[in-house]
C-alpha cells in the first residue's frame, strides 16, 4: 500500500466517524452552554421592577413544577416548568407596568390568553398573561407603574390571575428577586 493510499484510508475512517463525534460533542456540550446562558441571565439584574399587581397573592412560583398544565421540560425531574409567577386576584384588578418600555405585543394567543409584552431594551422584557382587558396597544410607550391592563382568566387558566414573566436575553428568570415590593403568599 502506498503512502497516498494509506492517507486516503485514514481520511475515510475519520470522515465516517466525524458525524458521530460531532453528535456526541453536541449532546454533551449543548446542555452546558444552555446552563451557562441561564446562569448569565440570572446574574444580570435589570434593576428593581414594580410589582405588577400589588394586592394579589402569589399562587405559583417560578421554576420546576408537578402541574401538568405547564409546558414540558427535560430540565426538571417533574418534567414541567413554569416560566413566570402567578399572582391571583379579583377579576379586573389593575395590572401595572413593571418597567418602562414599549408594548411589543398585545394580543390573544394560546395558553397565555390575552397577553402583552413590554420591552425595556433589547435584553429585558416583561410578559403579562391571562388578561381581561388591555389598556394599551402594540407600539405604545409605557412608564413603570402605569396602569396597562385588567386582570382576567383568559387562555389556559384556572381562575383570575396574572401570569407574570421576566425575560433577560430571551431567557426566563425568576421575577421575585427583581420586584421592589412584597407579595402575599397563598
Task: State what each model feature region is.
Residues 63, 92, 133-136, 156, ...:
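Disulfide-stabilized cysteine-rich extracellular repeat microdomains
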Residues 97-135, 160-166:
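Zn2+-dependent peptidoglycan hydrolase active-site motif and core
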Residues 1-46, 186:
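N-terminal secretion targeting segments of exported proteins
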Residues 38-114, 144, 173:
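Surface-exposed, glycine-biased beta-strand/turn segments
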Residues 90-92, 123, 131, 146:
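A generic structural motif
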Residues 60, 89, 105, 130-133, ...:
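A residue-level detector for short acidic-glycine micro-motifs
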Residues 58, 80-83, 114-120, 140-186:
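Conserved, short, structured surface segments that act as functional micro-motifs
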Residues 30, 128, 148:
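Short alpha-helical segments in extracytoplasmic peptidoglycan/chitin-binding modules
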Amino acid at each position: 500500500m502506498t503512502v497516498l493510499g494509506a492517507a486516503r484510508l485514514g481520511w475515510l475512517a475519520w470522515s465516517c466517524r466525524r458525524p458521530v463525534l460531532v453528535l456526541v460533542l453536541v449532546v454533551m456540550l449543548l446542555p452546558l452552554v444552555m446552563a451557562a446562558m441561564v446562569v448569565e441571565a440570572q446574574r444580570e439584574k435589570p434593576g428593581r421592577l414594580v410589582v405588577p399587581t400589588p394586592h394579589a397573592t402569589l399562587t405559583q412560583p417560578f421554576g420546576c413544577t408537578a402541574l401538568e398544565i405547564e409546558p414540558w421540560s427535560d430540565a426538571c425531574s417533574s418534567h414541567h416548568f413554569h416560566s413566570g409567577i402567578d399572582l391571583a386576584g379579583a377579576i379586573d384588578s389593575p395590572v401595572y407596568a413593571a418597567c418602562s418600555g414599549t408594548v411589543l405585543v398585545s394580543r390573544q394567543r394560546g395558553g397565555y390568553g390575552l397577553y402583552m409584552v413590554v420591552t425595556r431594551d433589547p435584553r429585558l422584557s416583561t410578559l403579562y398573561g391571562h388578561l381581561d382587558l388591555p389598556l394599551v396597544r402594540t407600539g405604545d410607550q409605557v412608564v413603570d407603574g402605569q396602569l396597562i391592563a385588567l386582570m382576567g382568566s383568559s387562555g389556559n387558566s384556572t381562575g383570575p390571575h396574572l401570569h407574570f414573566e421576566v425575560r433577560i436575553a430571551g431567557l426566563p428568570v425568576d421575577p421575585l428577586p427583581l420586584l421592589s415590593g412584597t407579595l402575599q403568599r397563598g
